[in-house]
């Protein structure tokens, strides 16, 4: 029996920026793209056939253990993606990319359905991302990415109730994503004058 072909015209992948030696005109054409293709169970040509874009068009250098990222430029490019792309499913590679699309404080492997599209917040594939150090993370990421790309719904595993140790004025919503990591979304703006710990 022949396996159904993946619908690359319905899939988009959005990354932060090209690598130091990467070609700005070919998003995900290097090692990170190969890693995504391997995790997705796609051959490299299928990955390249999907819509692809970097939110920062050039490598910006390092900052600490990660990379510099221009959020203002990224947010403009994210708006362009929403306006221009006619795809059903978009994989956001990294939390910086997710923030540019307005998704803050959500865990990796969370799926969001909004704007008539589905988004998957996927860990940045770079080797500097320590999230990949745990085998169970990679196994779960592979499972969920493949399901998402084939159009299946990614299961969300948010608990029905969880005791909070916060005061009522610090109400927040806590949940567990499909990979078991926790996210907290606060409903209260932090005070400009909050005490800092010594």
Q: Over which residues does each language-model region extend?
A:
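Short intrinsically disordered terminal tails
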Residues: 1, 164, 196-198
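A polyanion-binding, active-site-adjacent surface
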Residues: 1-110, 114-131, 135, 139-151
């Amino acid at each position: 029996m022949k396996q159904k072909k993946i619908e690359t015209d319905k899939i988009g992948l959005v990354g932060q920026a090209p690598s130091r030696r990467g070609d700005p005109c070919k998003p995900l054409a290097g090692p990170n793209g190969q890693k995504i293709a391997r995790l997705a169970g796609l051959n490299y040509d299928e990955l390249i056939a999907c819509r692809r874009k970097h939110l920062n068009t050039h490598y910006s250098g390092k900052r600490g253990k990660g990379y510099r990222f221009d959020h203002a430029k990224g947010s403009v490019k994210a708006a362009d993606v929403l306006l221009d792309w006619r795809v059903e499913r978009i994989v956001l590679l990294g939390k910086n990319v997710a923030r540019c699309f307005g998704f803050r404080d959500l865990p990796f492997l969370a799926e969001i359905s909004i704007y008539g599209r589905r988004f998957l917040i996927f860990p940045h594939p770079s080797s500097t991302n320590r999230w990949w150090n745990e085998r169970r993370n990679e196994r779960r990421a592979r499972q969920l990415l493949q399901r998402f790309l084939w159009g299946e719904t990614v299961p969300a595993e948010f608990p029905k109730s969880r005791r909070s140790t916060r005061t009522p004025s610090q109400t927040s919503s806590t949940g567990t994503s499909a990979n078991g990591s926790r996210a907290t979304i606060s409903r209260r703006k932090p005070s400009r004058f909050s005490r800092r710990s010594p």
